[in-house]
Design a protein with these regions (language model features):
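Glycine-/small-residue-enriched transmembrane alpha-helix faces in small-molecule transporters
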Residues: 1-34, 38-42, 72, 76, ...
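Hydrophobic/aromatic residues within transmembrane alpha-helices
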Residues: 25, 32, 84, 96, ...
Length: 307
């Protein structure tokens, strides 16, 4: 396994523990996200400044704007996600959040002119059924309706984040891109905090500061650094498929460490979500290989005729 692959896997495991660490912080969701983005954004900004190179975003303002929009959506999505963590549990909230890629795939024909194949539609159906199983099983244990809404809105914000990121070119990438996103995330959350909780910004000294620092510096700052620095060195197929290990690790870790119940419906829903997503990726790769083979075959035929 290459170094980039190890870094990417480590970042996914780190992200998968976000909910567990957040559950140890007795602060409002918006305050947790505010501290997280402040600490993580500051760390990455210092790394970029320490490189002593001219930042690429100065020469590519449009890309910077897309990344900033992506970061703002990320911050708002985290507010909803952390609220869902507290109301419906880490496992279900994480899986609801990762319905966001399904929204992106559903909109891809309109936004990115990507054609839906029968295999992709089958994968979509599996993911949607999995999400239904995960959420529907909670009716018997009185899951918070607002918690489910927060989980759904976090998925929508995830989709907005991805769409804005894809609109940006690779001119601004890696740690610089993640720094822009985290700083923009902090700005968006700070505006929300000032408007909605202007007089409540002070964090009590009795807060769990070790958990706050871990979530901000390690899970957000270092996690994003590992994630983005590895992503540029890995095939897109591997990045896409392995990315779904994050919600899986969140579910498993929440069951092992927090003792959250992992019911048969949870297991079946998890399998459908992950299996459907992976099936979509594999089917897309196979279709691309078939197109390449046909193109090469056509080129050989043309060459033979010319000869």
């Amino acid at each position: 396994m290459s170094r980039a692959s190890r870094k990417y896997l480590l970042s996914l495991l780190v992200f998968g523990s976000n909910g567990i660490i957040a559950s140890q912080i007795s602060l409002p969701s918006w305050q947790i996200v505010l501290l997280r983005t402040l600490l993580g954004g500051t760390l990455l900004a210092l790394i970029v400044l320490g490189a002593r190179k001219r930042p690429a975003f100065l020469d590519h303002p449009h890309d910077a704007a897309y990344l900033a929009s992506s970061g703002a959506a990320l911050g708002v999505g985290w507010i909803f996600l952390f609220e869902a963590y507290k109301l419906i549990g880490v496992g279900i909230a994480s899986l609801a959040y990762y319905c966001g890629p399904v929204i992106v795939m559903a909109l891809s024909p309109v936004l990115f002119h990507e054609r839906h194949t029968p295999a992709k539609l089958l994968g979509f159906a599996a993911v949607i059924c999995g999400a239904f199983l995960v959420v529907a099983q909670g009716k018997g244990v009185a899951l918070s309706p607002w918690g489910l809404v927060c989980g759904g809105l976090s998925a929508v914000m995830y989709a907005v984040m991805v769409i804005c990121s894809k609109r940006a070119s690779n001119a601004v990438a890696g740690i610089e891109a993640s720094a822009i996103q985290l700083v923009a995330s902090f700005a968006a959350v700070a505006v929300f905090a000032l408007v909605a909780h202007g007089s409540e910004l002070a964090v009590p000294l009795s807060a769990n500061w070790p958990a706050i620092l871990c979530l901000g510096l390690v899970n957000t700052g270092l996690g994003c650094y590992l994630y983005f620095s590895a992503m540029g060195q890995l095939p897109v197929q591997r990045v896409s498929v392995w990315g779904y290990l994050e919600p899986l690790s969140a579910v498993i870790l929440s069951a092992l460490i927090l003792g959250e119940a992992l019911t048969p419906a949870n297991v079946a829903g998890t399998a459908l979500i992950l299996g459907g997503a992976i099936f979509c990726e594999v089917a897309g790769k196979r279709r691309g290989a078939e197109k390449t083979s046909r193109r090469l075959a056509g080129s050989r035929s043309a060459s033979n005729l010319a000869a």
